[in-house]
Amino acid sequence: MKSLTKLLLLLPVAIPWQVTAQQRYFAEKSVVSFFSDGVVEDISATNSKVTSIFDAHDGEVAYLLSIKDFQFVNKLMQVHFNEKYMDTEKFPKSSFQGQITGFNLNSTGKQQVKAKGKLTMHGVTHDIDVPGTVEVVDNRLALKSKFIIKLSDYDIKIPQIVWQNIAQQVEVTVDFMYRPL
C-alpha cells in the first residue's frame, strides 16, 4: 500500500517530465546552404555540420553553425568567402534562436510553419520571420525552410571590383532532421 501511495504521489510529477522530454529534438549534421545568383557566375555553398535543438512543446528552436564548414565547389571561392567577406577569424559562428509557430506534434503530413527569431551572422543580429515546413517522419521531425537575406543587413561588404559577380541578396536553405532526445 505504501508503494502504491508513493507511486501515485510521484505520477503527476513524472508524467509531465516524460512528456516534455519526448518533445525535445536534436539535429546534428543538418544542412544549411546558400545560393547567390551572380551576373558573371553563381555562387553556392553547403554546410552539413549544423547542430540544432527544437522543443516541440513550446516551439523554441536554436541552431549553431561554423562559417568555415561551408563547402564550395571552387576552393578559391571558399578562401575568399572566409577571409574577405565573412571574416571568419573574427566571426566564426552564425546562430539562430527563436520560435516555431503553427506546428502540432500530433498532426500528420507537412505542416506550414513560421520561424521567428534572431539570426546572428558576421557579428550582427537581426529579427527574421521566415516560412517553412515541418513533417513528422518515423518519430523524427523534418524541418525545411527557404528564405532571402540581404548581405548589407549583416554588414557583409562586397568589394567594388567584384560587386557585379555577387548578388546583394542570398537565398538560404535550411534542411534539418531532428531525432528525439
Regions found by a protein language model. Give the residues of each.
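Low-complexity, acidic/polar, glycine-enriched regions of mature
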Residues: 21-181
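Bacterial Sec-dependent N-terminal signal peptides
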Residues: 1-24
